[in-house]
Amino acid sequence: MMRFLKWFFLTLREWFLKPATHRSAIIVANETLSRFIFSTRHFGRQPLRVKADAYMPSQGQVSVFRVDGLIAAQIWKIGDEIAEERDRTLYARGDIKAREVGRSGLDILPAEPPARHANIVGWPENDKPRQKLIALQLAAVATLVPKE
């Protein structure tokens, strides 16, 4: 119940503090979130999988994009724009359902701009082992989509 109230309050706060350019400020459980991967250390090729480091938080959050309703080319265009901004190479993405983030005890907050951007928040503070465990759980249910 407390997790729901926290999520509800944070979602309302985000909704009222800045306008959303995505179709909804509410993120539903079956919504797909893409984590763009800019490091070869964050995924494996044999077998194809997302590694936990791809989901380790930086400054208490993990950046993702809400990609429901987009075709693959549109998703990759978002990733390419981010890669260009950062002067990095885009190798792959990890796709995960929002429900899996919630099952791990984390929250997802829309964080636009850029359009469709959100952050996974609610990570244990100053507890790298717990953060790693949660990142492992997320990586285990994520689908790796290599860039062709």
Functional labels for PLM-detected ranges:
Residues 2-31, 41-48, 52-148:
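Conserved NAD+-utilizing ADP-ribose enzyme module
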